[in-house]
Amino acid sequence: MSQEFAHLSVLLEETVGGLNIKDDGIYIDGTFGRGGHSRQILQRLGENGRLIAIDRDPQAIEAAKQFADDPRFQIVHGGFGQLADYVEELGLVGKIDGVLLDLGVSSPQLDDAERGFSFLRDGPLDMRMDNSQGETAAQWLARAEIEDMAWVFKTYGEEKNARHIARCIAADRDKTPFLRTKDLADLIARITKNKERNKHPATRVFQAIRIYINSELDQIDQALEGALTVLAPQGRLSIISFHSLEDRIVKRFIRRHSQGESVPHGLPITEDQINKSRKLRAIGKAIMPSDEEIERNARARSSVLRIAERLDY
């Protein structure tokens, strides 16, 4: 792998350590990427352990060949939202000792201009995690209604100027279609008046389009529910998120399943019954990267790690 597209796994020790790995355990790396977390898991597993890695990026599947000679490892080409389906096919429901998810876009995807994720590198406006199928960002921008674009920019990018940007895109695309990242980034920079300090004006819109094109938040919801289904008692969830939308979903999921089902006041139900509805317990507080890690890897700055354990009821 070229140095240009090298990937530094964020919160590596903390995330893998949070899985509390057993020698003969069965683990899932739901976001293989370039294998940083998988490598650490394999180093801690015994000879009877097992690691199932998942990724929908064809380049990640290619990178997984580095572990082809390790009988403990297997790679699945698909989205982590379907992890419960993959585990069911393998007959391992209720036997998984840990699930790791490193959410969002990876450094190699951002750094490769041909993938179209970055407003800093000119390339085709693609943004698909799996670039072998599905609609590209350029195709969506060419057909989307103004209202739909504004909703996506506001909901997934928390963009204050969502409607104005959507209108300008619609007006400009009739003359020249948006086919490259630079086309879109330049337009947003040109029409944005109140620019945020130390943040490119296109940051939020690019994030929003990427999340929409890849159904990222739906994938997270599905993966979390799936993990709850497949985890063994005392199995661990170790999840890194990179922006507030992701972290909010993870935080609320852990909180909801740590508190148990809410019941109307006065309903005749015992404390034991309420406890049995609890499926998770949070392990410690949210973990942030150290100043030293941020200095080594600026992309770690916004990362948050949350760890939870499946309860045995």
Curated annotation (Swiss-Prot):
Entries under SUPFAM superfamilies matching the protein: Putative methyltransferase TM0872, insert domain, S-adenosyl-L-methionine-dependent methyltransferases
Pfam families per the UniProt record, alphabetical: Methyltransf_5
Top-level taxon in the UniProt lineage: Bacteria
Localization, UniProt: Cytoplasm
Cross-referenced InterPro entries: RsmH, SAM-dep_MeTrfase_MraW_recog, SAM-dependent_MTases_sf
Coiled coil: none
Key words, A-Z: Cytoplasm, Methyltransferase, rRNA processing, S-adenosyl-L-methionine, Transferase
Catalyses which reaction(s): cytidine(1402) in 16S rRNA + S-adenosyl-L-methionine = N(4)-methylcytidine(1402) in 16S rRNA + S-adenosyl-L-homocysteine + H(+)
EC code: 2.1.1.199
Listed GO biological process terms: rRNA base methylation
UniProt-annotated binding residues for S-adenosyl-L-methionine: G35, G36, H37, D55, F80, D102, Q109
GO cellular component, one term: cytoplasm
GO molecular function: rRNA (cytosine-N4-)-methyltransferase activity
Family designation: Belongs to the methyltransferase superfamily. RsmH family.
NCBIfam families: 16S rRNA (cytosine(1402)-N(4))-methyltransferase RsmH
Known role: Specifically methylates the N4 position of cytidine in position 1402 (C1402) of 16S rRNA.
Protein name (database record): Ribosomal RNA small subunit methyltransferase H
Organism: Shewanella sp. (strain MR-7)
Gene (name only): rsmH
